[in-house]
Amino acid sequence: MGHHTFDPEKADRLEDAARRYRYLSMEELVGALKPSNDAVVADLGSGTGFYADDVARFVGKVYAVDVQDEMHAHYREKGVPENVELVTAEISDTPFETDALDAAYTTMTYHEFASEDALDEVRRVLKQDARFVVADWSSRGSGEVGPTTDERYSKDDAVSALEDAGFDVERADERTETFVLLARTQ
């Protein structure tokens, strides 16, 4: 299950607003994060920075974390906002200090890094009572868009994994092709 990375040759598809917002709008993401204007937030699996651009308008700093330098190259070509810093790292091994982040989110990339080590790392770098938003492709979806269903997680498996890592899952919504979770650190 999971742990593939998105093909950088198809990176332009990640900038299709109609397609991306169909599954998670900027308003829903920012509303779930509820950031202060000086918040420090991480976009985990940021790709070309589609959602980082949105969130950057509402916070002090966004760390756009991606394992692929090629994705950061696409983001640089597009133009990186002044308050966004590109970080090349595995989610299981980020360069952040303990309790460094006010919030984190992952949009359609949870299946690429989901593991006990990665979730423990996310928990480590988030402050007490910080929000973690997970929007990803559901194994209950058709697989006609996004990764194949065998690369996806179910909402229930994702909830269990977050709870096992010390998160309190406050909301878990199942949708046609995706699920969205809102969790907090305990």
Residue ranges of predicted features:
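N-terminal, positively charged/glycine-rich alpha-helical extensions of SAM-dependent methyltransferases
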Residues: M1-D12
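Conserved SAM-binding loop and adjacent beta-strand
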Residues: K10-V30
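C-terminal alpha-helical "lid/dimerization" subdomain adjacent to the S-adenosyl-L-methionine
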Residues: R13-A17, R131-L182
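Glycine-rich helix-loop-beta junction characteristic of Rossmann-like nucleotide cofactor-binding loops
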Residues: V30-S36, T94-P95
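Class I SAM-dependent methyltransferase SAM/SAH-binding core
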Residues: A42, G47-T94
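A short SAM/SAH-binding and catalytic strip from SAM-dependent methyltransferases
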Residues: D102-E116
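A short glycine-rich, Lys/Arg-flanked "PGG" loop and its adjoining helix->strand segment in the class I
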Residues: D117-R131
